[in-house]
Design a protein with these regions (language model features):
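A short, surface-exposed loop/turn module that caps and links secondary-structure elements
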Residues: 29-54
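Enriched for short, Lys/Arg-rich terminal
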Residues: 1-5, 11-12, 17-22, 55-59, ...
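Lipid interaction determinants
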Residues: 22-23, 45
Length: 82
């Protein structure tokens, strides 16, 4: 199982979207434990080493390594890619 790490910006985003924070944390923990379970919700971003996961109307931008997932940003569907 890989560990999930959150950047300072991602933690700020989690506090801002409090009601969604629980769902985001659970989705990332589930993906870290079994990537195949959420494979249809994860897409590699074009021109970047990052990937994104869909959690309802929110997107989680993260970087994957063999030992950890680093969550970079969390936000609503339209503005998270800016």
């Amino acid at each position: 199982m890989r560990t999930v790490r959150y950047t300072t910006e991602a933690l700020r985003n989690l506090k801002r979207y409090g009601t969604v924070a629980t769902r985001v944390r659970k989705a990332m923990d589930d993906y870290a434990a079994d990537p195949a379970a959420h494979a249809n919700n994860v897409t590699r971003l074009v021109g970047s080493a990052a990937s994104r996961m869909r959690v309802g109307d929110y997107r989680v931008i993260f970087v994957e390594t063999p030992v950890e997932l680093t969550v970079v940003r969390i936000g609503p569907r339209g503005g998270v890619y800016d």
